[in-house]
Amino acid sequence: MASLSFAQIKLKNPVADFARARPEFGLRRSRRVGFRVLASETQKEPDLSVTVNGLHMPNPFVIGSGPPGTNYTVMKRAFDEGWGAVIAKTVSLDAAKVINVTPRYARLRAGVNGSVKGQIIGWENIELISDRPLETMLKEFKQLKEEYPDRILIASIMEEYNKAAWEELIDRVEQTGVDAFEINFSCPHGMPERKMGAAVGQDCALLEEVCGWINAKATIPVWAKMTPNITDITEPARVALNSGCEGIAAINTIMSVMGINLDSLRPEPCVEGYSTPGGYSSKAVHPIALAKVMNIAKMMKSEFSEKDYSLSGIGGVETGHDAAEFILLGANTVQVCTGVMMHGYCLVKKLCDELKDFMRKHNFQSIEDFRGASLQYFTTHTDLVKRQQEAIKQRKAIRKGLQSDKDWTGDGFVKETESMVSN
């Protein structure tokens, strides 16, 4: 990911210093005092557009793979509402093997005993990939690209451990004109039973082999979607990038059991009296997703800073501020799936407005102005202890006053002077 987020930045003030440092990294110079715009400078409307792996999007908000991208009608709606890109629901060669059940969702609410009036903070699904015939989905991909040639349509694909099957799927999907692939290496339920989804994403040797097949065949950008159900998410992300993928998407859902009905003693969602662990999403996963994305971004900054790789953040995005957090941690784009299921496709307008408000507050003109800006403030706990001990030492010294002429420093000269004033 060749961007500011992977530059080596050492700043003291987390906001004002970042603005002053930006010109050092080839970004736009402007006349600023801190973040207050001078009277002679007219503030421009923030530009939300992004270019990722050569793909131009009007904003960084992407429909995540799932029900919001399940057919032509809903994907058309997403484009009409103004989403930056759409990732279709995952397809494979043989949809006949995909059999869904109902109910397939369960919700977790905040409040006393999960009151029905409480805010929805968690969402579990046991839904599989697309159960529609591949040929039908391919026709709809082609139709969408014909009707929206300037909009970005990304195909999410998944196959069994079979090189020929992967090659056939890639070839057939590419012929529709889609702009990129997102490889589903991360679905935590159902598909791993067929050595698909997370079964590949959790096995780095298997992942390396399959990524090799995919990238030898694909002629459009490839993103690898990571599973959070692993000890160190940077390991498969590194393997995917080293094996030819141009981008990483993280995270997919977290393996979970939503709860037990205390009247029936049966798990939720309950299908004929039984259930199975599923994928957890929505607001409650947001902090976990931020940590995973932060770790991936730091790895990419350290090991792939010269490459034009991308990072797509996923997990609990319902506001523009949620999105800003992912971008501050290095994400180029932000995906929304459960949020659309809860609030509708019109959510994108709110996301754009709130992200622009954040950018105006800090006088950021583009996404690149602040992408990755917060990465530098993550360190080890050992380093935090050292920093705090030093800060306490300095505060004590200032309160005590200077003991000798040798104690004067240039950096804290004014404070040092004030420390010896009596009134």
Model-identified regions with their sequence ranges:
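N-terminal capping/small domains of soluble enzymes
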Residues: 2-167, 351, 403-423
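Short secondary-structure boundary segments
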Residues: 89-91, 185, 252, 338-339
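Alpha/beta enzyme core
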Residues: 76-81, 139, 146-147, 154, ...
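Alpha/beta catalytic cores of nucleotide-metabolism and tRNA/nucleoside-modifying enzymes
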Residues: 2-44, 280-308, 318-423
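Thr-Gly-centered strand-to-loop micro-motif
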Residues: 64-65, 312-314, 336-337
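C-terminal helical cap(s) of enzyme catalytic domains, especially alpha/beta-barrels
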Residues: 95-115, 259-277, 340-364
